Amino acid sequence: SLEKMHGFPTGNTGFLKGVSALYAGVIEGNLLIAGGCNFPDIPVADGGKKAYYRDIYIAPLSNDTAFEWKKIGQLPQAAAYGVTISTEKGLICVGGTTATHSLSDVFLLSLQKDTLKRETLPSLPVTMDNMAGALVGHSLYIVGGNVNGIPSSAMYMLDLSDLSGGWKRETDIPGEPRVQPVCVAQDGKLYVWGGFAPAVEGHQASLSVDGYMYSPETKEWSSVATPYDAEGNEISLGGGMGTSFGEGMILCAGGVDKDIFLKALQGIYAGKEYLSHPVEWYRFNRNLLLYHPQTDKWTTLGEYEQGARAGAVIVSQDGFHYIINGELKPGIRTNEINRIKEKRR
């Protein structure tokens, strides 16, 4: 089932409008959100300037649908488009970008007696933003995104049990560069789908729908099934979200429409005209999708407007999956948080 949550931090009128690409996770039984970006004043279609946020908020998690938020600190700088990984010790925030530059910073946020602590971890050897990541055992993997400002298919790994070793470059994911892919760990393997890349010197724009599974033992990628809807149409999860679900499954939601967004990347759709259509025109993915690793098959849980987001973040805890903010169409955010509840056997 899917239910709307109530309550969003009100301390900053810009942030209150909802953001994309925030840092988020579960920390000591609380949902933590931080950073993110939006166009709070003038819409992007009218040349508005993107604002980035710095505040960190927490709200206790319960079965209740109401959040009570409190500000608990600030990020080192206003940022968005990084990766947040929940660990036993706290939340690890990796990379991202500010209004002016991409980041290589990595740090651990932890709660000690209601006080937020920040511990510096080894920095990435490159700057990374708009990437994805997941934890397999004590290996933290970060894949795709912009690496030193260029769309990439690179992957880096940090062994959390041996921080002195720093980040290591792992096997690139096959195919085109993948900005804003979806990455989920399940049963000791890493799964990645989707992603796109604007044109850069020597490379034309691309959009990927395919997926791969990475085995840490062999350090090799193998192809897995492309997501598709009930009619059999392939779905782009680029800009979407994914999380482990139920008994060994993976839940994916959101993402841009593969045909429309590729035309935007190619410049066929551009400027104010492209940005001024109604929400429905952009056809963000409405399907809640379940991937079954054992059979390499996809099923759909149905179509939900609440899942049709790009740049939303999904956070999971005890059979609840929170879809946080994101955009309804390019430049237009929502401050909604919706919760998917697993059916318990």
Predicted feature locations:
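Kelch-like beta-propeller repeat domains
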Residues: 1-345
